[in-house]
């Protein structure tokens, strides 16, 4: 259901694939993505990344600085967001730049619609 890989995950999801996805696969995919949002801190990280201009990425340390959490906690939340398909990262020297997976908000919305309609 995704296209475009980086070292730390998928860069973009293909919205057209939802049309041909069966209902059970759709529910499984929706559950996977929902797990990523199952914590208020992860929702805040997604919100921060969503508000960022698409051509600019957060350095992971910027996210740590913006949240009242230890670096290890933020890293754990970013790891879960990557594993569940919300975020990808790219190496930039000694730093990792984080961004939302392209089309992920629309993809999530369409999965919800399809899961409810069928």
Features from the language model and the residues they span:
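N-terminal leader segment of winged-helix/HTH proteins
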Residues: 1-37, 84
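Hydrophobic alpha-helical core bundles mediating ligand binding, dimerization, or RNAP-core interactions
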Residues: 27-31, 105-116
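N-terminal helix-turn-helix DNA-binding core of bacterial DNA-binding proteins
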Residues: 28-70, 92, 96-103
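Hydrophobic side chains within alpha-helical segments
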Residues: 45, 79-80
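Alpha-helical residues within the helix-turn-helix
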Residues: 65, 76, 82-83
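Residues in the helix-turn-helix
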Residues: 73
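Base-recognition residues in the alpha-helical recognition helix of bacterial helix-turn-helix
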Residues: 76-77, 94
């Amino acid at each position: 259901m995704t296209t475009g890989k980086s070292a730390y995950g998928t860069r973009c999801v293909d919205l057209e694939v939802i049309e041909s996805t069966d209902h059970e696969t759709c529910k499984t995919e929706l559950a996977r993505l929902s797990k990523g949002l199952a914590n208020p801190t992860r929702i805040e990280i997604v919100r921060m990344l969503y508000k960022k201009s698409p051509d600019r990425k957060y350095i992971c340390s910027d996210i740590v600085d913006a949240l009242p959490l230890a670096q290890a906690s933020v890293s754990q939340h970013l790891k879960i967001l990557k594993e569940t398909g919300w975020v990808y990262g790219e190496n930039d020297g000694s730093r990792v730049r984080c961004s939302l997976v392209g089309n992920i908000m629309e993809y999530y919305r369409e999965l919800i619609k399809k899961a409810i309609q069928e």
